From Swiss-Prot:
Belongs to the methylthiotransferase family. MiaB subfamily. GO terms for cellular component: cytosol. Residues 396-466 form the TRAM domain. Keywords: 4Fe-4S, Cytoplasm, Iron, Iron-sulfur, Metal-binding, S-adenosyl-L-methionine, Transferase, tRNA processing. One of its GO terms (molecular function) is N6-isopentenyladenosine methylthiotransferase activity. The gene is miaB. Residues 490-506 have a biased composition (Low complexity). It comes from the Bacteria. This is tRNA-2-methylthio-N(6)-dimethylallyladenosine synthase. It holds the Pfam family Radical_SAM. Monomer.
């Protein structure tokens, strides 16, 4: 589907200083939603840079691209709120262009241009590669361009990618999903599952490692169904084991699996592959078997708890995280109590908790017994209070433990106020740590081994008593970070873990306390 829609605002001529001939246009990509969207945004940035655009330094860019989410209602509100704010900016900057892509664009299509006629281009999840051409066409024709494909045009992995992190990277192993969860609109927007061949995936991982990356996260809507297209039920566990053979790749993670298809061979591969991290994100959604049936989740709470038992038997210190929806249509107090019971038994390190949001086009939107907002809010608060307590108790078990932390790039006021650096442990816990006086500071991508001295619900703190309690391991990734700073004319302080922050997970932020 390709439409050209007249847009009076798009018809302005490029006269801003930044659009002067010979001067490169600037861009900004704003991402809403999941990890898949974060990775897609890296591709959008890569496409724009290949077309000659450069990242914007300030707030105003020649091109602003929104990569949207359609999972919850507030995603719509967030997009249109941002578009409204940009209207006056665009009027004050002739030649500026705005593009909207992602899941909401795939779903709403013409609605976006009707609600925000100052948008220049709308594209979907299946034709990310069309972005530069749509912008050029909109500029040339002085009309908004809308192009939505109903199936995948080119597998996204073939597109250029601008990675926001030199030490860690996302690698898609599949796109789309064959499940039919009643609350989820993603399969209708991203299509049926399509799997990449193992050789292509491993080649991309090797290229990342060659560029300095030490950590990779394998991405898919349902990673453990990987291989369905070429008939290999153990393809994902084989892929994990193959990652263990890549020299220089120190950490491998994946997200997200589905409990219904999570098999013992994957657990064995996690336990037996040296660089597979002791961390698992396993979406629960509900602890009520009745609600799980209404959600069409294809497993029950006993199976879910059985998976956790098997994982912890093979990987005793594994940190397990989850997703939970509160207030699904028809959820009773008894159903909700079943969720609380499963959460108590599961001992999650953290949980992404969501209030059910009615999404037109999903089967759940037509279910009877949609719950009042006040009931959903009250249950949500009880669930988060329980999970916060459990997270604090689980983190308290880390006190006195030595952990290896992959240092991340620092940004924001808090990093300057506390004089601590931050990173992720092998089990993905957030660790804030200080560098002893006289010790060498790490770079993003380096590793430090420290002892946990404080614990809170959402982070750990390590304040070494002296240099003997702090071990720095400089890495290829740290070297790559130094090169990236030199290439971008950055001038970091010697040894300081500062600079541009890495890619956000694109997931709801957990509240944090000051370290």
């Amino acid at each position: 589907m390709s439409l050209t829609i007249p847009s009076p605002i798009a018809a302005t001529t490029p006269s801003a200083a930044s659009m002067t001939a010979g001067e490169p246009k600037t861009y900004q990509v704003r991402t809403f939603g999941c990890q898949m969207n974060v990775h897609d945004s890296e591709r959008m940035a890569g496409l724009l840079e290949e077309a000659g655009y450069v990242p914007a330094d300030g707030e105003v860019a020649d091109v602003v691209v929104f990569n949207t989410c359609a999972v919850r209602e507030n995603a719509d509100n967030k997009l249109y709120g941002n578009l409204g704010q940009l209207r006056q900016v665009k009027e004050a900057n002739p030649g500026m262009q705005i593009a909207v892509g992602g899941c909401l664009a795939q779903k709403d299509r013409e609605t976006i241009v009707k609600k925000a006629p100052w948008v220049d281009a709308v594209f979907g999840t299946h034709n990310v590669g069309a972005l530069p051409a749509l912008l050029n066409r909109a500029r040339h024709n002085n009309e908004a361009q809308l192009e939505i494909l109903e199936s995948l045009d080119v597998f996204p992995s073939t597109l250029p990618t601008k990675r926001d992190s030199v030490y860690a990277g996302w690698v898609s192993i599949s796109v789309g999903c064959n499940n039919t969860c009643t609350f989820c609109i993603v399969p209708s927007l991203r299509g049926k599952e399509k799997d990449r061949r193992p050789g292509e995936i491993l080649a991309e991982i090797q290229a990342l490692v060659d560029d300095g990356a030490v950590e990779v996260t394998l991405l898919g809507q349902n990673v453990n169904s990987y291989g369905v297209e070429f008939g290999d039920r153990q393809a994902f566990s084989k892929l994990l084991r193959a990652c263990g053979e890549i020299e220089g790749l120190e950490r491998v993670r994946f997200t997200s699996p589905h409990p219904a298809a999570f098999t013992d061979d994957v657990i064995d591969a996690m336990a037996e592959t040296h660089n597979a991290m002791p961390q698992l994100h396993m979406p629960l959604q509900s602890g009520s078997d009745k609600v799980l049936k209404d959600m069409r989740r294809s497993y029950r709470s006993s199976k879910f708890l059985g998976i956790l038992d098997k994982v912890r038997d093979r990987i005793p210190h594994a940190a397990i995280t989850t997703d939970i929806i509160v207030g699904f249509p028809g959820e009773t107090e008894e159903d909700f109590q079943a969720t609380l019971d499963v959460v108590e038994k599961s001992r999650f390190a953290s949980a992404f908790t969501f209030q059910y949001s009615k999404r037109p086009g999903t089967p759940a939107a037509d279910l009877p017994e949609q719950l009042p907002k006040a009931v959903v809010q009250e249950r949500y608060e009880r669930l988060t209070a329980l999970q916060d307590r459990i997270a604090a108790e689980e983190n308290a078990k880390q006190l006195g433990r030595k952990v290896e932390v992959l240092v991340t790039a620092q940004s924001g006021r808090k990093a300057g106020e506390t004089h601590r650096l931050s990173g992720r442990s092998k089990d993905q816990r957030l660790v804030h740590f200080s560098v002893p006086a006289g010790a060498e500071a790490p770079r993003p991508g380096d590793f430090v081994t420290v002892t946990i001295t404080e614990a809170a619900a959402f982070h750990l703190v390590a304040d070494p008593a002296g240099a003997d309690d702090y071990l720095l391991r400089r890495s290829r990734a740290g070297d790559a970070w130094d090169r990236s700073q030199a290439d971008s004319c950055g001038v970091p302080a010697a040894g300081a873990a500062s600079g541009k922050a890495g890619v956000s997970l694109g997931m709801p932020s957990l509240p944090t306390r000051r370290a």
